[in-house]
Amino acid sequence: MMSTLSYTLGQLAAHVGAQVRGDADLPIQGLATLQEAGPAHLSFLANPQYRKYLPESRAGAVLLTAADADGFAGTALVVANPYLAYASLSHLFDRKPRAAAGIHPTAIVAADAEVDPSASVGAYAVIESGARIGAGVSIGAHCVIGARSVIGEGGWLAPRVTLYHDVNIGARVSIQSGAVIGGEGFGFANEKGVWQKIAQIGGVTIGDDVEIGANTTIDRGALSDTLIGNGVKLDNQIMIAHNVQIGDHTAMAACVGISGSAKIGRHCMLAGGVGLVGHIEICDNVFVTGMTMVTRSITEPGSYSSGTAMQPAAEWKKSAARIRQLDDMARRLQQLEKRLAAVTSSGDASSDA
């Protein structure tokens, strides 16, 4: 049976530096949305579009800004940024199991691998020759840590994560199930129509505080390492090809594809399904909207999009039909421009006579 986590509202307020408006001894046993919260839940209002749910919410207390709290009759924790406060408090209610330190008897650890005594190695995990596992690292069941790979302190690997050889991971990195780090990059040379394989002799280097989602793949470099900066956040099912460089604190949503040798700056955001061609550069502070295909370098910060927005199917079909007519329309427009120029030129000549 799952035990109940419980904190007083005052304890939660102290954790995030909030001002309590109401009963500081109120017990809180979980977090929930405004629509779903009950009397034992703490909720939050961060997005104005959900303000309409605040008056009728059954939440025991709500994280609010001072402005929103002034008109609220219920119990509140007043903070400058409710969403950040919610993020901090979420860890208090996280029920993710914490593995005990030690190596499971079914795990296979090479004689010359180094595993910190405070680390946890799960059932049937494999740690190959020369690998180094830092303090407090948790390695889930059936993970494979390749030769000479390094995992920094506080790392967490869900079950069935694969690190190939020579992968260097910084501190406090979380990797979800199915991720493959350090697979061979897609490198081939064409000889008279036949593809000859290029050995991928680089590695992968990942900074501190990185999160990597389920079934995401990061290929090793052809010569130098593929580089993932500090604080990068990668969603599920992302493909990062060989030699890619991603700057600090950049975030990518699911199904992004980054082609080889692309460079992405710091503090960028790539929405779901974005694709980048290879050998281009994206500067810092760029936001790319969902399903955009980036085919050239971006040198100025800002928001970028491509493709067509959603519209009713019948209208979309008409738009698609017009796209097929663009070449003919352009040709006809050029003809009209030439005729107009001729008429204008003729008129000017007549007025001069």
From Swiss-Prot:
GO cellular component: membrane
Pfam families from the UniProt entry: Hexapep, LpxD
Positions in coiled-coil regions: none
BP terms from Gene Ontology: lipid A biosynthetic process
Enzyme Commission numbers on file: 2.3.1.191
UniProt KW Acyltransferase keyword: yes
Keywords, ordered alphabetically: Acyltransferase, Lipid A biosynthesis, Lipid biosynthesis, Lipid metabolism, Repeat, Transferase
Active site: 242 (proton acceptor)
GO MF entry, a single one: N-acyltransferase activity
Pathway of action: Bacterial outer membrane biogenesis; LPS lipid A biosynthesis
Catalytic activity, reaction form: a UDP-3-O-[(3R)-3-hydroxyacyl]-alpha-D-glucosamine + a (3R)-hydroxyacyl-[ACP] = a UDP-2-N,3-O-bis[(3R)-3-hydroxyacyl]-alpha-D-glucosamine + holo-[ACP] + H(+)
Role summary: Catalyzes the N-acylation of UDP-3-O-acylglucosamine using 3-hydroxyacyl-ACP as the acyl donor. Is involved in the biosynthesis of lipid A, a phosphorylated glycolipid that anchors the lipopolysaccharide to the outer membrane of the cell.
Description of how the protein assembles with itself and partners: Homotrimer.
Recorded family membership: Belongs to the transferase hexapeptide repeat family. LpxD subfamily.
Name recorded for this polypeptide: UDP-3-O-acylglucosamine N-acyltransferase
Lineage of the species this protein comes from: Bacteria, Pseudomonadati, Pseudomonadota, Gammaproteobacteria, Pseudomonadales
Gene: lpxD
